[in-house]
Every structure is written in structure tokens, then in C-alpha cells.
Curated annotation (Swiss-Prot):
Occurrences of domain GST N-terminal (ranges): 1-82
UniProt-listed Gene3D superfamilies: 1.20.1050.10, Glutaredoxin
Family under the similarity heading: Belongs to the GST superfamily. Phi family.
Every GST C-terminal domain range: 89-212
Source taxon at top rank: Eukaryota
Name used for this protein in its record: Glutathione S-transferase
GO molecular function per UniProt: glutathione binding; glutathione transferase activity
């Protein structure tokens, strides 16, 4: 029984897992979930993720949800496959873990709100809340200031090598690069170079093909 990833490829959380699977050069089945029809809140999906959110993931008899837990499982379990996505000693692993937490607690909440307001709402025919955009642009700028300082001394957030701490940013960055928010990244040279590096990875190019 092979790996199955449940969810729409348009979802940043689903894309986070697809990118990890592609970095590891692993075969998997992407199982569509019609969120507009509310299928993520019904059986059989709700058995896989009782919170009714995408993605859900199966590897044999193992069932997981929460995208970052899934990516860590893949990176650890298939460490000998594809590209290494984890730090290689306890201290480096701790630093990587710090920046994984920063992504989930500081970067993603703000980036997700901006993506919703600037990208998703127009797609759904909804009106963008300009005040919310301005507020979250300011918040994102402050986060990216910290990143700029970190990336002056380190090629990647976790150290010299690309890890999950960097990969986890890719879906939100990919959406924001097509909006005016791109200027927040471009105006910080180390952040800009880091972002370009991540989005130019072959595995990411393969991952975004699923959105077509």
C-alpha cells in the first residue's frame, strides 16, 4: 500500500507536503478533496483528520494530519532517499527546529492572511480588506527584518544546508511573489536571494505542476 496525500493541490499546506515528497523523490497518490462541497468535513475524510482540515496523509497503516508533522515524518523515515532535509547533529537540529517554529508561529499566520486577502478573495469574487492587508504587511515586514539579519550570517535559516525550515515557507512565498507583497521580500537582499533559491529548486518546480 503506497503513500496517499489527501487534499487539493491549491492548498499551501498540501503543497508543503507535495514539495517534501518531491525532494525525497517518492511516489505517492494525490487524492482530491472537494472543499467547496464540504467534503473535508464529511466521511471518509473526517476519519483521517477529525479537525476537517487538509491535508491528511497515509503511508501503509499510518495515518497522519498536520502538514508539518507529515513533512517531518517523511524526512525522518525516508532520510536515505532524495535530498537530505534535516540537520545532521543535535545542535544543528535544534537550530533548525527553532526556525521551523518561527515559520509556523510568526511567518505563516501573517503570510496566510495576506494570501487570503490578496489572492483567494479576488478568486472567489470577495472584496479585499485593505486595512487587513496594510496591518499584515507591516507585521510581515517586521518578521522579514529578523530573517534578513539571520540570512546575513547563514545561507539558509537552519544553517548552511536547505532543510524543512526553509521548505515550509515555499507555498506561501510562491503565492505572495505574484502580488505587491513581493516588494517586502525584494527590498531585503538576503531574504530575496533566499526566496529565489527556494522557489528555483527542481523539487518545487515539480510540486507546483500539481496546481495546474
Amino acid at each position: 500500500m503506497g503513500m496517499k496525500l489527501h487534499g487539493p493541490a491549491m492548498s499551501p499546506a498540501v503543497m508543503r507536503v507535495i514539495a517534501t515528497l518531491k525532494e525525497k523523490d517518492l511516489d505517492f497518490e494525490l487524492v482530491p478533496v472537494n472543499m467547496q462541497a464540504g467534503d473535508h468535513k464529511k466521511e471518509p475524510f473526517i476519519t483521517l483528520n477529525p479537525f476537517g482540515q487538509v491535508p491528511a496523509f497515509e503511508d501503509g497503516d499510518l495515518k497522519l494530519f498536520e502538514s508539518r508533522a507529515i513533512t517531518q515524518y517523511i524526512a525522518h523515515t525516508y532520510a536515505d532517499k532524495g535530498n537530505q532535509l534535516l540537520a545532521n547533529d543535535p545542535k544543528k537540529m535544534a537550530i533548525m527546529s527553532v526556525w521551523m517554529e518561527v515559520e509556523s508561529q510568526k511567518f505563516d499566520p501573517v503570510a496566510s492572511k495576506l494570501t487570503f486577502e490578496i489572492v483567494i478573495k479576488p478568486m472567489l469574487g470577495m472584496v479585499t480588506d485593505d486595512a487587513a492587508v496594510a496591518e499584515n504587511e507591516e507585521k510581515l515586514g517586521k518578521v522579514l527584518d529578523v530573517y534578513e539579519s539571520r540570512l546575513k550570517d547563514s545561507k539558509y535559516l537552519g544553517g548552511d544546508s536547505f532543510t524543512l525550515a526553509d521548505l515550509h515557507h515555499a507555498p506561501a512565498m510562491n503565492y505572495l511573489m505574484g502580488t505587491k507583497v513581493k516588494s517586502l521580500f525584494d527590498s531585503r537582499p538576503h531574504v530575496s536571494a533566499w526566496c529565489a533559491d527556494i522557489l528555483a529548486r527542481p523539487a518545487w518546480s515539480k510540486a507546483i505542476e500539481y496546481k495546474q
